[in-house]
Design a protein with these regions (language model features):
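Conserved helicase motor
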Residues: 63-72, 145-149
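Class I SAM-dependent methyltransferase SAM-binding "motif I" and its flanking Rossmann-like core
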Residues: 103-162
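Alpha-helix capping/helix-boundary segments
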Residues: 45-47, 94-95, 124, 174, ...
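Short beta-strand scaffold positions
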Residues: 41-42, 100, 169
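A contiguous loop/helix-start segment that scaffolds small-molecule binding in enzyme catalytic cores
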Residues: 2-10, 61, 85-86, 164-165, ...
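Glycine/small-residue-rich loop that forms an oxyanion/phosphate-binding "nest" at active or ligand-binding sites
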Residues: 66, 73-123
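Short active-site oxyanion
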Residues: 33-39, 113-117, 165-166
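Glycine-rich, flexible N-terminal cofactor/catalytic loop recognition
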Residues: 1-67
Length: 266
């Protein structure tokens, strides 16, 4: 940590980490991990694995900072910052605060006048949006859909008439039911893209209608991390005509689309 004048506060750095492959880490991330003295990590094992994969020797004191402890550990981290200690905030994958811990600490630091900066990098949201082939000029990120059925139905009903492309996170085991509910609220023919295991060895990008994708997801276990992209009302994929010309089926539930045969899992 650089020398500071007495009374000068530390800096909170939000560090984006790879969403799949360790080698996607930026040189700046490698440098910051190497020199960090305090790391607030969603999963301490994950940050140690990442450091080992990057041949980085961690010298930092690592503080566990996940959803269940975020509220009670924020004051302590804020005190560290106010005492002049820099804090590097990392999550399991992607950017802190985006469906991951970080918001509370950032809000508290901002209110206290702490300097906050970002070490930009991978994001499953923009990665999925970019490869989807759906319009990218306007979009909304919806995170994980609500767990309670009533809340989910209300949320989907509100979004059904939205003209923006929608991006969701979902687990593999809930994907089929989510796609079925979206088909009921948004229309069976609404275009969507399932992005599974983005940037990883078993990455899969599957395009189709909500109904077709729901049928595919319901036909076998879908494993891995899912980012779902759904077209806005009245908006179509810019590559839809190309997909048809290469023989891809309109419904992914029968023959799959351009990125490979139907996949039942793993």
């Amino acid at each position: 940590m650089a020398e500071r004048d007495e009374g000068q506060t530390g800096v909170l750095t939000l560090a984006a980490v790879p969403i799949g492959r360790a080698e996607d880490a930026s040189p700046r991330l490698v440098a910051e991990l190497s020199r960090a003295t305090v790391i607030a990590a969603e999963d301490t094992r994950r940050v140690r694995w990442l450091a080992a994969s990057l041949n980085v020797t961690l010298r930092a004191r690592i503080i566990s900072y996940y959803d269940a402890v975020e509220a009670r550990r924020t004051p302590g981290l804020l005190s560290e910052l106010q005492a002049g200690q820099d804090v590097l905030l990392v999550t399991d994958a992607g950017t802190p605060g985006i469906s991951d811990p970080g918001y509370r600490l950032v809000a508290a630091a901002a209110a206290a006048g702490i300097r906050i900066t970002a070490l930009p990098g991978p994001s499953a949201v923009t990665t999925a949006l970019a490869v989807s082939g759906l319009p990218t000029d306007r979009f909304s990120f919806e995170g994980f859909p609500p767990r309670r059925p009533g809340e989910r139905q209300r949320r989907f009903a509100e979004l059904a008439s939205d003209h923006r492309t929608q991006v969701y996170f979902e687990s593999g085991r809930r994907l089929a039911s989510t796609l079925s509910e979206l088909a009921a609220s948004h229309g069976e023919d609404r275009q969507a893209v399932v992005c599974r295991e983005l940037t990883k060895t078993h990455e899969e990008i599957r395009r189709g209608t909500l109904a077709g994708l729901a049928a595919w997801a319901g036909s076998g276990a879908v494993r891995g991390e899912i980012t779902l992209v759904v077209a806005g009302l009245g908006r179509r994929s810019r590559t839809r005509g190309t997909a048809r010309s290469t023989g891809a089926a309109r419904s992914a539930g029968t023959t799959g689309t351009a990125d490979g045969p139907p996949h039942g899992g793993g």
